[in-house]
């Protein structure tokens, strides 16, 4: 029913070129042996398809019609649900229909620039009907601005790019469970009917073998009471459930006479305080389970119930029916009795078994369209109440649809979702892979999902049904482990929200190219072989018995005739990021997890370089991520510049593609595009015209290929530390550009308007040298911390004047108006070059918040070279911090004098079990050197013809689970091309004789040398290093604030104090607890003494001690300090003008704690 079919006609091919289907793709020699009959689907389809369904996009409607399903858009569906809205008497009604959109108001770029939301005006047709007179009034009503999805699956909300993450939730339906009672150790079974919205209905067999029911989580009562309340007589119950002693015993004990008594009994349990009547009890039960407004199973819930219980009622409603309840009770009784099958009312035989809630047949995905639809449903239901009230209060003659409707609840619900929902995330834009995986994320958290505190191990664990649907490797480390997943490469979400994966159909033992998409439930009924099972020329299995997967079982050997399906690709089970790890099959899963996650943290470098050793996934990932410019129509390149590429298409149309130049991403990395085509070049549709960040020739390029030696070196690479060559610093090999945005606004204050100006009090001309006449820094200026970016003054109010000044003011009638310098300055520890300025002003009709007259944004770019303390990583979870940067001449070098770029420690490999990094190093050397296979060796018999010879600097693809074998690596290492001196520097084992750069002597043992792909991660030491001398203090405790963002101090905690006490360092400890912390008077005096060169004065009483005294006083304990029988005043030594002294020294004693925005990642 749900299976999609794709028929591809092709036969086994020997072509080794990775990434077919993208014209102009760079050549990459592939070790792949297995032909994939199905191309990787669009990697952003989970977002774009779902949003297309929501708004009823024309291309989505065309695809739905082609599939043979009725194209009902999500918005039309929710409007149909709520219509008609009737008043309390039923005399008039309002019907909403035909949702449609006008053109979006501004382009994506303009929205980002001006802090707007990328949205289109949304209109519906509202029809008001007066049922008494038959009068109909129809009107088009504006429903607000509807946020639209960009071409790359994102939303722009208030100028920031956001992603709505898909949510993994338990599917509506009926679920059967089994547990063992702790006291009696008897089996107890239960059943739950879970709707999409509405009350739960729970049945259970307890340890006393009685069958009970709980309605809406209330008190348990016999199941026969519910059946009688539904109108069943005792005879009918006996006729239907006569086979079940459980129910017959319950019926015998049941003293409820008939339907009326049963209804009253249920009412008493559900509404204990209210007086029960037959009508109210009947309405209560009807509203709980049988009214569409109050109870909704959703299409998927109805499908799951019908499938589980074997009901085949055509056009069954989305509410519960008597048949559902009766079939659920019968299923539970038979399950408790230990039966294996049951004949459903329709004559269908269904298996009787308990459900696994973590199975992907019972968990579904709420994609972006459904999440927004649910939010609109909430907004419309709030609007419905307003409409009802207005119907009763307004004059019937004067009513129009527009006057009845208030769209504010709908707009507010949308705003709330996009702005504050856990599933609407600030987009991860560190690099194209990060943004792509962000859109393919599946989260079990969020409203209606799990909470990370309550989620147990079972729900986080890898499940066999995840195969081909959700990646078993890629998930965050930390509290969210297992609750966030990523869609596998070939997976797709079907109309019910279940994740499907494709399989090749096996017919009469022959593997065909016909592809079926199966859900986890459907796959459980079949026997599936893996993609790398050898086939003959006709597509039949070579082995008589082959390993397969079956429901609930480990891999087992079966006869080849029993196989129903075969995987379409070896990389079918992993996600995009995991599929980009070469030799994944040789890495431990924990390290592969780190490798997949760390690829998302790579920062774009000044010059990107595609990996020598790739997996063939790089091109497709980069193109689908949307950071490269892709040609739309075949034609000829007419004009190329740094800012745009113009293509004259074959049909005579001309299109210019604009480049993004040095834009700031959400994470502060640099997003820049540059053309890779030439004037006059022929380009095909789908060909990459320009590279973006982290791409080279249209392929994902997250790092650099560096010559690596794996060896210890003087202990400087102990514990994962890394030694780098100075060459990488000098030649900007690992240099990245980071762009910071600084913003300031000029507001109206109670004392007058703030002003952006060059005229700043008490500031020298040197400081103002880079400011223009408006007071804004010029583009191109080099700035460092403390420099003024935008000059601004704020009114201070009237000041106290001396009598003489007062007399002069009275004579000349001039007020003493003073201003404070509140200029925007470069924050502590930052520097760079000003690359952009945006000025928004109320005078220019820019849309600014209330009270703001002017807003200035300054963009400062910083070129960060690699340095000690920065974090580097490979793709196999092999991460480390740079411990030392050696001069190039001191680095170990090869026999031909080539110095290595990076030295990694051998200890980083064995216990971590990520051998993939060693194999990558060897294959990297092979690709860099080139190779030629001589003769006809045994190891090369499976290599495609084109792989027998390759020039130097060849890029290679080794796809996951279908890559280079160990014997091929050994053979190719022995077949590498010699250098210009005719030498092969690396032997068959991948090792070379290295020479010590300092002494020129060879090291006593051969060392593994090759090329490894190294990423520079976003954990940069410049963002983390922090020091403070004086700074802000907390208003309450008078102690320094904490953290780099607040320019805080280092916490000296309780245990650190113990350490000081243990060493008897009394004076150091006193200093730390007083003048370096909260001795308000003492710290000012110390600062003064340091400035003047005097001795440090005695510390005073810390503020926290005074707080302690106040707390004791609150307990009615008076604390006094006595000296020679006389009380000593604790406030002793308070300098009345210490505030003034501090001000003169330029320090602020009690700056309030600033609230800083923290970015949420992933």
UniProtKB/Swiss-Prot annotation:
Keywords linked to the UniProt accession: DNA-directed RNA polymerase, Nucleotidyltransferase, Transcription, Transferase
Its EC number(s): 2.7.7.6
GO cellular component, as recorded: DNA-directed RNA polymerase complex
Keyword S-adenosyl-L-methionine belongs to the record: no
Domain of life: Bacteria
One annotated GO biological process: DNA-templated transcription
A single GO molecular function term of this UniProt record: DNA-directed RNA polymerase activity
Reaction it catalyzes: RNA(n) + a ribonucleoside 5'-triphosphate = RNA(n+1) + diphosphate
InterPro entries: DNA-dir_RNA_pol_bsu_ext_1_sf (IPR042107), DNA-dir_RNA_pol_bsu_external_1 (IPR019462), DNA-dir_RNA_pol_su2 (IPR015712), DNA-dir_RNAP_su2_dom (IPR007120), DNA-dir_RNAP_su2_hyb_sf (IPR037033), RNA_pol_bsu_bac (IPR010243), RNA_pol_bsu_CS (IPR007121), RNA_pol_bsu_protrusion (IPR007644)
Function: DNA-dependent RNA polymerase catalyzes the transcription of DNA into RNA using the four ribonucleoside triphosphates as substrates.
UniProt family annotation: Belongs to the RNA polymerase beta chain family.
NCBIfam families documented for this protein: PRK00405.1 (NF001616), rpoB (TIGR02013)
The protein's assembly and partners: The RNAP catalytic core consists of 2 alpha, 1 beta, 1 beta' and 1 omega subunit. When a sigma factor is associated with the core the holoenzyme is formed, which can initiate transcription.
Annotated PANTHER family: DNA-DIRECTED RNA POLYMERASE I SUBUNIT 2 (PTHR20856)
Name this polypeptide is given: DNA-directed RNA polymerase subunit beta 1
Taxonomic classification: Bacteria, Bacillati, Actinomycetota, Actinomycetes, Mycobacteriales
């Amino acid at each position: 029913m749900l299976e999609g079919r794709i028929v591809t006609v092709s036969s086994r091919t020997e072509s080794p070129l990775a990434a077919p289907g993208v014209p102009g793709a760079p050549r990459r020699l592939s070790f792949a042996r297995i032909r994939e009959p199905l191309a990787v689907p669009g990697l952003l389809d989970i977002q774009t398809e779902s949003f297309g369904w929501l708004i009823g996009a024309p291309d989505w409607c065309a695809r739905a019609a082609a599939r043979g399903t009725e194209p009902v858009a999500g918005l039309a569906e929710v409007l149909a649900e709520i219509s008609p809205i009737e008043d309390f008497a039923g005399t008039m009604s309002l019907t909403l229909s035909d949702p449609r959109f006008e053109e979006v108001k501004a382009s994506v770029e303009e929205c980002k620039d001006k802090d707007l939301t990328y949205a289109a005006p949304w209109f519906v047709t509202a029809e008001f009907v007066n049922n008494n007179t038959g009068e109909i009034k129809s009107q088009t009503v504006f429903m607000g601005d509807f946020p639209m999805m960009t071409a790359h699956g994102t939303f722009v909300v208030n100028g920031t790019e956001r992603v709505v993450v898909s949510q993994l939730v338990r599917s509506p339906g009926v679920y059967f469970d089994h547990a063992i009672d702790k006291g009696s150790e008897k089996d107890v079974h239960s059943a739950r009917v879970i709707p999409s919205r509405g009350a739960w209905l729970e049945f259970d067999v307890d340890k006393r073998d009685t069958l009970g029911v709980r309605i809406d989580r209330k008190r348990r009562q016999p199941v026969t009471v519910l059946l009688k309340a539904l109108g069943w007589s005792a005879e009918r119950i006996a006729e239907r459930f006569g086979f079940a002693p459980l129910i017959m015993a319950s019926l015998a004990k049941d003293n409820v006479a008939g339907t009326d008594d049963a209804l009253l009994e249920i009412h008493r349990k559900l509404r204990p305080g209210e007086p029960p009547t037959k009508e109210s009890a009947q309405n209560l039960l009807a509203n709980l389970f049988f009214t569409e407004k109050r109870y909704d199973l959703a299409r998927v819930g109805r499908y799951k119930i019908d499938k589980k219980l074997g009901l085949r009622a055509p056009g069954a409603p989305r509410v519960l029916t008597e048949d559902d309840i009766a079939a659920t009770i019968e299923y539970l009784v038979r399950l408790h009795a230990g039966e294996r099958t049951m004949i459903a009312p329709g004559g269908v035989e269904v298996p009787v078994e308990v459900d696994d809630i973590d199975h992907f047949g019972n968990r579904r995905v709420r994609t972006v369209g459904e999440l927004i639809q649910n939010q609109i449903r909430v907004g419309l239901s709030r609007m419905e109440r307003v409409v009802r009230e207005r119907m009763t209060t307004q004059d019937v003659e004067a009513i129009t649809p527009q006057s009845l409707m208030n769209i504010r609840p709908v707009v507010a619900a949308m705003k709330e979702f996009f702005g504050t929902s856990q599933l609407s995330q600030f987009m991860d834009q560190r690099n194209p892979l990060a943004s792509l995986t962000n859109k393919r994320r599946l989260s079990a958290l969020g409203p209606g999902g799990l909470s990370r505190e309550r989620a147990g191990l079972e729900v986080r664990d890898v499940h066999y049904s995840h195969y081909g649907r959700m990646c078993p490797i890629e998930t965050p480390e930390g509290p969210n482990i297992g609750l966030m997943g990523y869609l596998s490469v070939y997976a797709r979400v079907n109309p019910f929200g279940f994740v499907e994966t494709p399989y090749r159909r096996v017919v009469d033992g022959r593997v065909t190219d016909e592809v079926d998409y199966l859900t986890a439930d459907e796959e459980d009924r079949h026997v599936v072989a893996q993609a790398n099972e050898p086939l003959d020329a006709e597509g039949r299995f070579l082995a008589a018995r082959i390993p397969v997967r079956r429901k609930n079982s480990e891999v087992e050997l079966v006869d080849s005739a029993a196989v129903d399906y075969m995987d379409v690709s070896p990389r079918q089970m992993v996600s995009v990021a995991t599929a980009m790890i070469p030799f994944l099959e040789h890495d431990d899963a924990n390290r592969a997890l780190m490798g997949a996650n760390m690829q998302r943290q790579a920062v774009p470098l000044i010059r990107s370089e595609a990996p020598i050793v790739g997996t063939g996934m790089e091109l497709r990932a980069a193109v689908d991520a949307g950071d490269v410019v892709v040609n739309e129509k075949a034609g000829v390149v007419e004009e190329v510049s740094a800012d745009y590429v113009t293509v004259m298409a074959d049909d005579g149309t001309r299109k210019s593609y604009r480049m993004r130049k040095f834009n700031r991403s959400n994470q502060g990395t640099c997003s820049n595009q540059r053309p890779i085509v030439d004037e006059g070049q022929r380009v095909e549709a789908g060909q990459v015209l320009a590279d973006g960040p982290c791409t080279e020739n249209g392929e994902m390029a997250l790092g650099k290929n560096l010559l690596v030696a794996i060896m210890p070196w003087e202990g400087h690479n102990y514990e994962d530390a890394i030694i780098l060559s100075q060459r990488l610093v000098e030649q900007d090999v690992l240099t990245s550009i980071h762009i910071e945005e600084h913003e300031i606004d000029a507001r109206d204050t109670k004392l007058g308007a703030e002003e952006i100006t060059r005229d700043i009090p008490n500031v020298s001309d040197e400081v103002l040298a880079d400011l223009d006449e408006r007071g804004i820094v010029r583009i191109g200026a080099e700035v460092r911390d403390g420099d003024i970016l935008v000059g601004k003054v704020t009114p201070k109010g009237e000041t106290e004047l001396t009598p003489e000044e007062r007399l002069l003011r009275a004579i000349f009638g001039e007020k003493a108006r003073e201003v404070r310098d509140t200029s925007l300055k470069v924050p502590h520890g930052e520097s760079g070059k000003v690359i952009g300025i945006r000025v928004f002003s109320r005078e220019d009709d820019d849309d600014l918040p209330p009270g703001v007259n002017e807003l200035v944004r300054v963009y400062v770019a910083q070129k960060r070279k690699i340095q000690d303390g920065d974090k580097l990583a490979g793709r196999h979870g092999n991460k480390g911090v740079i411990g030392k940067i050696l001069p190039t001449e001191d680095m170990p070098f090869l026999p031909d004098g080539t110095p290595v770029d990076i030295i990694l420690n051998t200890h980083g490999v064995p216990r971590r079990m990520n051998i993939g990094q060693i194999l990558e190093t060897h294959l990297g050397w092979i690709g860099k050197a080139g190779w030629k296979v001589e003769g006809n060796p045994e190891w090369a018999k499976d290599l495609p013809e084109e792989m027998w010879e390759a020039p130097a600097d060849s890029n290679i693809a080794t796809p996951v689970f279908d890559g280079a074998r160990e014997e091929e690596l050994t053979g190719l290492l022995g077949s590498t091309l010699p250098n210009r001196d005719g030498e092969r520097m690396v032997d068959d084992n991948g090792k070379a004789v290295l020479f010590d750069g300092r002494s020129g002597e060879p090291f006593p043992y051969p060392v593994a040398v090759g090329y490894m792909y190294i990423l520079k991660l976003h954990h940069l030491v410049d963002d983390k290093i922090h020091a403070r001398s004086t700074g802000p203090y907390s208003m309450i405790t008078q102690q320094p604030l904490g953290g780099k963002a607040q320019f805080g101090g280092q916490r000296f905690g309780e245990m650190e104090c113990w350490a000081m006490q243990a060493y008897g360092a009394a004076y150091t400890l006193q200093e730390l607890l007083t003048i370096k912390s909260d001795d308000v008077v003492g710290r000012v005096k110390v600062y003064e003494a340091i400035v003047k060169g005097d001795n440090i004065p005695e510390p005073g009483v810390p503020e926290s001690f005074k707080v302690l005294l106040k707390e004791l006083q609150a307990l009615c304990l008076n604390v006094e300090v006595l000296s020679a029988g006389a009380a000593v005043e604790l406030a002793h030594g308070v300098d009345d003008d210490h505030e003034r002294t501090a001000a003169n020294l330029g320090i602020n004693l009690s700056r309030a704690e600033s609230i800083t925005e923290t970015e949420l990642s992933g």
